[in-house]
A protein has these predicted regions:
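Helix-start/capping segments and mature chain N-termini
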Residues: 1-186
Length: 186
């Protein structure tokens, strides 16, 4: 889906979804508000936008049209779902497969300030998005205000391990312990 790792910009003015809306649903209208801010981010040299909460733009919610996950040390951290974050099947699949292969997963709020702090400490190892079309989209850098932060590749990438496991299940090359595949017959 994406031919390269993404560079993303953390949005601190515009919002994709607001409390009381339908941001939790996979609805086309939820992404119309993304066009203009994404165009602005692209003009700055970024591929996608990291969406933050509409109240104070501090809690990270999603990236582009995907769920977002962070590897902090050896833990996979992803934002809690809410009325502004889609509790989608791709997100659920990534969480389950990560647990299946022995990765510790934590669902909780993560703020922009925490992300930058973890980056500065060297404990932010990976960022990736997950969605239906992309499965997993690795993120190689993120921008916030005037700063840009580069994420170095890691040899034991959680994103690669999770994607490989999901694709093998999809292609019937691995067991499907969760009953996700359905045989289609004529």
């Amino acid at each position: 889906y994406y031919s390269k790792s993404l560079s993303v910009y953390i949005e601190d003015k515009f919002s994709r979804a607001a409390p009381g809306g339908a941001g939790y649903a996979k609805a086309a209208g939820n992404y119309g508000a993304a066009f203009y801010p994404t165009t602005l981010a692209m003009a700055k040299g970024f591929d996608q936008v990291v969406w933050t909460d509409s109240t104070n733009h501090q809690k990270i919610e999603e990236v582009g049209t995907m769920s977002i996950a962070f590897r902090i040390n050896d833990k996979l951290v992803t934002p809690l779902t809410s009325d502004t974050i889609l509790d989608g099947v791709s997100r659920k699949t990534v969480i389950q497969v990560a647990k299946d292969i022995g990765i510790d997963v934590e669902e909780r709020d993560i703020t922009v300030q925490e992300l930058i702090k973890k980056y500065d400490e060297g404990s932010l190892k990976e960022i990736f998005g997950c969605g239906t079309a992309a499965v997993i989209a690795k993120i190689s850098s993120f921008g916030y205000k005037e700063d840009k932060f580069e994420i170095e590749d890691v040899s034991d990438s959680y994103a690669d391990k999770i994607k490989e496991s999901i694709v093998k299940i999809q292609q019937n090359l691995a067991e499907d312990p969760h009953g996700w595949r359905y045989k289609v017959e004529e």
